[in-house]
């Protein structure tokens, strides 16, 4: 309209342009999530409102929705979510956002997981989570009975005298036999090279002095079994967990073997930090 009412060229040549009314100034309303102009930050609105939640609340929300049903999930359909366990000290619901399926339950294992009422009550999350670790066979924390498997009866009958199912009999026959090894201290001698050495990495069958692995001479590279094997234990109290009143006792003839005990008071190694356990299938 301003172009139609007022001419675009001046009326008198050589004279300045006539006064021209500006078009009406409309000040558009800025959305509240955008800054009014550059240089001054305004309140921003996140693209996804659920991004405001922290990791813990986000995992709790997803776990709660997963309990209601699969149609209440927050992710896309036909997609899979994978939870990666990084650190055992991290909370279970932060490690994996799959609700109660945080860790798989191994049937028959010594570490069974049960839902414990606590801070995750109502969500069905397993807490606390126990992570099995390897324990030394000669440690006080271990139990020899846990390392023995029941011997299968190949006669085809159970203890009660009833006939066994052929499927169960096949499973017993296919079950692997474990041989648990125990670390001991051994003394070696090579007669060809006239060399003697000691080693604390002698793996014997648990409860016996039967050596499972041979050690090679560093000169002739021949495998040898130790001529003498002894347990890594205190030389005074004869226990893997030292109970002597003295803080330290050293055998001057073999100080290295004494230091490898690791359970005497004041020693360099401690029982909780020593892991020496192997098994062979």
Swiss-Prot record:
One of its GO terms (molecular function) is mRNA 3'-UTR binding. Disulfide bonds: none annotated. GO terms for cellular component: cytoplasm; cytoplasmic ribonucleoprotein granule. Signal peptide: none annotated. A zinc finger (3CxxC-type) spans 183-267. It comes from the Eukaryota. mRNA-binding protein required for maternal mRNA storage, translation and degradation during oocyte maturation. Controls timing of meiosis during oogenesis. Probably promotes formation of some phase-separated membraneless compartment that stores maternal mRNAs in oocytes: acts by undergoing liquid-liquid phase separation upon binding to maternal mRNAs. Binds to the 3'-UTR of maternal mRNAs, inhibiting their translation. Disordered regions undergo liquid-liquid phase separation (LLPS) for the formation of membraneless compartments that store maternal mRNAs in oocytes. The 3CxxC-type mediates binding to the 3'-UTR of mRNAs. This is Protein ZAR1-like 1.S. It comes from Xenopus laevis (African clawed frog). The lineage of its organism: Eukaryota, Metazoa, Chordata, Craniata, Vertebrata. The gene is zar1l.S.
């Amino acid at each position: 309209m301003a172009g139609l009412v007022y001419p675009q060229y001046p009326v008198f040549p050589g004279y300045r342009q006539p006064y021209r009314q500006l078009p009406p100034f409309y000040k558009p309303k800025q959305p509240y999530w955008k800054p009014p102009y550059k240089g001054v930050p305004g309140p921003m609105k996140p693209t996804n409102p659920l991004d405001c939640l922290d990791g813990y609340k986000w995992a709790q929300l997803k776990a709660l929705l997963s309990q209601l049903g699969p149609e209440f999930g927050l992710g896309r359909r036909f997609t899979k979510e994978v939870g990666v366990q990084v650190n055992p000290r991290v909370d279970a619901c932060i490690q994996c956002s799959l609700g109660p399926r945080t860790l798989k339950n191994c049937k028959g294992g010594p570490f069974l997981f049960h839902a414990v009422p606590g801070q995750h009550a109502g969500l069905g999350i397993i807490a606390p989570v126990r992570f099995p670790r390897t324990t030394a066979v000669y440690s006080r924390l271990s139990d020899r009975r846990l390392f023995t498997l029941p011997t299968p009866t190949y006669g085809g009958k159970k203890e009660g005298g009833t006939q066994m199912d052929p499927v169960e009999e096949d499973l017993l026959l296919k079950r692997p036999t474990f041989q648990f090894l125990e670390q001991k201290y051994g003394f070696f001698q090579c007669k060809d090279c006239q060399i003697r050495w000691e080693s604390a990495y002698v793996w014997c069958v648990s409860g016996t002095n039967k050596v499972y692995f041979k050690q090679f001479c560093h000169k002739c590279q021949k495998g040898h079994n130790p001529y003498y094997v002894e347990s890594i234990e205190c030389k005074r109290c004869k226990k893997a967990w030292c109970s002597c009143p003295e803080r330290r006792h050293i055998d001057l003839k073999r100080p290295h073997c004494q230091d490898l005990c690791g359970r005497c008071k004041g020693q360099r190694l401690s029982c909780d930090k020593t892991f020496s356990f192997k098994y062979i299938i």
